[in-house]
Swiss-Prot record:
Residues 261-455 form the MH2 domain. Residues 192-243 are annotated as: Disordered. It comes from Drosophila melanogaster. One of its GO terms (molecular function) is transcription coactivator activity. Residues 192-212 have a biased composition (Low complexity). Phosphorylation on Ser-453 and/or Ser-455 is required for interaction with Smurf. Phosphorylation on Ser-25 by key/Nemo promotes export from nucleus and antagonizes BMP signaling. This is Protein mothers against dpp. Belongs to the dwarfin/SMAD family.
Length: 455
């Protein structure tokens, strides 16, 4: 037998041996028949194989799952697995929430986060209930739709009462150092709330807080015309004429999604490093590693060089690790800390929602996720600000920029007073809200007072 024959036989034997070890059970093959999408075949197979091993221990569970997948329009029972300590499931070096994993496999391959899912009322063991069992039946969950934001109605002829043409938080004194609050999966700690709630009201408390920088928004009357109110007219014949007359006095400015939902700039102290990263994927990870594959969903800080980098920056960069997961779903932006060290976030939209001072810095520890921007709340603020003049609307541009530092924090509880004193930080610009503001400001015309860096 010559060498070629020996090599051929050896290769054939190895192939046979490999196929034995990679044997896929009939139950797994059958369930994979309902898989959605073409990507990550191996990952999906491992996820389903892991599930089948768990369901085999429960009589009728696999059959119930097959019934749910084959007849999606028919009612089905819960298909459950035991809840792990941290609620997550590991599949091939990747951890995820079980109901998200299997909804991604069998219904929505583009699913990014559990924030996009809501359980149906018939589900007895939804993930959100935090019971010992978790339902992974993909037809016991529905996908949350992105809310349609109403257009902003800009008056063509603005008339303001003397002394009331500007939003009052222009005149609120910024603290010498930002307040600090700490967040966890159970919410903000009580110490944080007691030390920062004195400065600003949340949407629910803003009316009762006389010191709130947003106080003028709460008392702002709604625009002269609201499409939802038009249906309440007692005289159906007057509706069309009233609409025409009122719409002649206002310009409708609608929100539209941009090609890139955000851009990210990386800084070391007060120096920008590298190119701006444009986010076209709704899920983006900013980490401290290099990215040889140039994935569009990863912004890797490890590959960026800076000749002015000192030892503190070098040490901080080593601790960024897995960094932060940013995801944009249903008009909301979330930040999840994947690093072993905390991240620190300054988001005026988030601070407004929680009733903190606009400049407050929130600490997000490892493993925690925080909503850092809400398009609907921004839309309400924008609609109300239009009645307060150009400067009031322009002030909202600050809400469209989010600053985030890695490992090292800043503010009243830290020796660094400003974000530019932290070794490693990023600035996130939200393109959709910024473009919406720009269109509204264009409709409003020139400001009554000159806009400057100190206005």
């Amino acid at each position: 037998m010559d060498t070629d024959d020996v090599e051929s036989n050896t290769s054939s034997a190895m192939s046979t041996l490999g196929s034995l070890f990679s044997f896929t059970s009939p139950a797994v093959k059958k369930l994979l028949g309902w898989k959605q999408g073409d990507e990550e075949e191996k990952w999906a197979e491992k996820a389903v194989d892991s599930l089948v091993k768990k369901l085999k221990k429960r009589k009728g569970a696999i059959e119930e799952l097959e019934r749910a997948l084959s007849c999606p329009g028919q009612p089905s029972k819960c298909v459950t697995i035991p809840r792990s300590l941290d609620g997550r499931l590991q599949v091939s070096h990747r951890k995820g929430l079980p109901h998200v994993i299997y909804c991604r496999v069998w219904r929505w391959p583009d699913l990014q986060s559990h924030h996009e899912l809501k359980p149906l009322e018939l589900c007895q063991y939804p993930f959100s209930a935090k019971q010992k069992e978790v339902c992974i039946n993909p037809y016991h969950y529905k996908r949350v739709e992105s809310p349609v934001l109403p257009p902003v109605l800009v008056p063509r002829h603005s008339e303001f009462a003397p002394g009331h043409s500007m939003l009052q938080f222009n005149h609120v004194a910024e603290p010498s150092m930002p307040h600090n609050v700490s967040y966890s999966n159970s919410g903000f700690n009580s110490h944080s709330l007691s030390t920062s709630n004195t400065s600003v009201g949340s949407p629910s408390s803003v009316n009762s807080n006389p010191n709130s920088p947003y106080d003028s928004l709460a008392g702002t009357p709604p625009p002269a015309y609201s499409p939802s109110e038009d249906g309440n007219s007692n005289n159906p014949n007057d509706g069309g004429q009233l609409l025409d007359a009122q719409m002649g006095d206002v310009a409708q400015v609608s929100y539209s999604e941009p090609a890139f939902w955000a851009s990210i700039a990386y800084y070391e102290l007060n120096c920008r490093v590298g190119e701006v990263f444009h986010c076209n994927n709704n899920s983006v990870i900013v980490d401290g590693f290099t990215n040889p594959s140039n994935n569009s969903d990863r912004c890797c800080l490890g590959q960026l060089s800076n000749v002015n980098r000192n030892s503190t920056i070098e040490n901080t960069r080593r601790h960024i690790g897995k960094g932060v997961h940013l995801y944009y779903v249903t008009g909301e932006v979330y930040a999840e800390c994947l690093s072993d060290s905390a991240i620190f976030v300054q988001s005026r939209n988030c601070n407004y929602h929680h009733g903190f001072h606009p400049s407050t810095v929130c600490k997000i520890p490892p493993g925690c996720s925080l909503k850092i921007f809400n398009n609907q709340e921004f839309a309400q603020l924008l609609s109300q600000s239009v009645n307060n003049g150009f400067e009031a609307v322009y002030e909202l541009t600050k809400m469209c920029t989010i600053r985030m530092s890695f490992v090292k924090g800043w503010g009243a509880e830290y020796h660094r007073q400003d974000v530019t004193s932290t070794p490693c930080w990023i600035e996130i610009h939200l393109h959709g809200p910024l473009q919406w503001l720009d269109k509204v400001l264009t409709q409003m015309g020139s400001p009554h007072n000159a806009i400057s860096s100190v206005s």
